[in-house]
Amino acid sequence: MIENRKRKPLDMLHGSIWNKLPLFALPVAATAILEQLFNASDIAVVGNFTGAGKTIAVAAVGANSSIISLIVNLFVGIALGANVVIANAIGRKDKDAVTKAVHTSIIIAILAGIGVAIAGELVAKPLLSALQVPGDVFPEALLYLRIYLIGMPVILLYNFEAAIFRSTGDTKTPLVILTISGILNVLLNLFFVAVLHMTVNGVAIATVVSNAVSSILLFYRLVKTKELIHVDWKKLRIDRKILGQIMRIGLPAGIQSAVFAVANIVIQSAINSLGTVVMAASSAAYNIEIFAYDILNSFSQACTTFVGQNYGAGQIKRCRKVLILCIVEGAIATACAIVLILLTGKALLSIFNNDSQVISVGYTRLIMVLSACTFSMLYENMSGYMRGFGFSLIPAIVTTLGICGVRIFWIMAVFPSHKTFAGILTAYPVSLSVTALLIFLVLVIYHPSKRFQTDKGEM
């Protein structure tokens, strides 16, 4: 199914940068967008094939988005730590470190996935209760979450495997495999819901099965490849030193990614208090607006990986050039995505739910959230730049204060006196602008390209 032909790695250390960044970033963005589309198919299918209960089914899936994002984003950040460690080792031409980091990453993913699956089953009900999920939505939301959590081992394994490939500059292999598993996901969604007349349990099972397929296919590629990232069954063990390096970079990055979900859990709780229509509208809009974030975040990932390899090779000036180009090219790509989404927003919302009230409320969210994407693009690229140097903790702390702190304060202090959907959504531009300013100040004060100029050894 997947050819084992040799794919030439993207040379991040030599030649022009501007034309290579899109070659790395756009497949990453396409992978994330396809992943969102396939995830959105859960909502689209239950919203169109579950009859009179469609609004409850859509709200049930949407009610879990913040919890699932919290878990997945945390470990995607840790996987990014693995990406940086491997990229830096490639830049240093340290084959032994690359091998140890790859095998350690695989074990981290499997063990973490099992742990999350077990712990998640125990706390699923209290979590949904804390989110104030309405009584008519709660049973379906709980069923969806519990089935989804069973798939955490394969979901996390795929994300770590994708990070391993991206550390070499290969962003196309994860894209191809995700496309295969994603098409399977859509077909299974339709089969379970439209044919077998299942509800949220059908789309949850389809998600688990398709993620299992993607993780198995990527693992097969890692076993068969002759590149530095080759996986040998006999070498699958955790190297403590490498584990420490991955966690030192990845855990703060994971916390930074999870901050979105933590803050959004608080926001989701406020949204839930406004009723089922607002819940359904917000859920549908989120699945559209995230496309713009996927575009800007792909350039942040490119920034991290390019800087990681060049820092390992001691090419500090090239690292600074990477940051500037990522901001410029990321801004152009993000602006194009925003315009396209706003022009087609109402039509896209109708795919999830054709209720006119849901579409109107959902479009309001699109306008307000997308207006803040410029701030997201700036702070994500600056954070990605610093992560490439292994400088991850302080940006994570600042992001926690800027996003999580501001949004929680907004919901606790401002929302009670302005209990409208717009009152909730204003938290997005406020928190993101504050965070962009704080991250810029960190970059100016710590200046990692100078701070690490003479310290380009092991991270």
Residue ranges and their predicted role:
Residues 55-66, 141, 145, 204, ...:
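Small-residue hotspots at the loop-to-helix junctions and early N-terminal turns
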Residues 58-118, 155-174, 268, 281-339, ...:
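Small-residue-rich hydrophobic transmembrane alpha-helices
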Residues 1-25, 86-151, 195-251, 307-372, ...:
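Short alpha-helical transmembrane segments in multi-pass integral membrane proteins
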Residues 79, 147-166, 174-182, 203-218, ...:
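Short runs within selected transmembrane alpha-helices of multi-pass transporters and secretion channels
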Residues 33, 37-59, 128-135, 191-198, ...:
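Helix-terminus/linker motif at the lipid-water interface of multi-pass membrane proteins
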Residues 28, 32, 44, 84, ...:
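Transmembrane alpha-helix boundary and packing residues in multipass membrane permease domains
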Residues 14, 18-37, 41, 67-74, ...:
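Residue-level signal for short hydrophobic patches within transmembrane helices
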